[in-house]
Amino acid sequence: MVFVLRVARIILNAIYIIFKIFPQKNKVLFLRQQSDDPTLDILMLRDKIRELHPNCKTVLMCKSVPKSFFGKIGYCFYMLGQLFQLATCKVVILDSYSIVSLIKNPRPMVVQMWHSIGTMKKFGYSTIGKKEGHSRAMADAMRMHKNYDYILCAGKGYVDHLCQGF
């Protein structure tokens, strides 16, 4: 599986390089893969961006990875759309781990939005090698939690806990 992820990462980066030929736009991209619907946080942030920056386009791409084999094949094509939007936006806001981590040197500013529930569970690097987590090799192949410029959280009280996972 690690080999497959590494090959996929090379392919995705090659496609991303092609998409970077297109101009960057005044656009904020929201990516979410845990659900097909945006969270209230995403909608509120999108609305505030629209209010403060009416000339900035906002794009929501919310789609969970399907369970079926053919659904996963279809999701690969959806990822191409994500790559194009990523290559042509100025800011991307992530609600969960996403394709951005697989890209080497993404062009836009990358913001990871973390919900307060994160202090109630272990995640990311704090679970490597444990039952609920990935192996170190898999985490490295996925480039888990890489490429973030900023991480949004509910407050300063969450910082130490979140640093363990990132």
Which sequence ranges carry the predicted segments?
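Active-site and donor-binding regions of nucleotide-sugar-utilizing enzymes
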Residues: 29-166
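Membrane-proximal basic amphipathic "stem/tether" segments
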Residues: 1-35
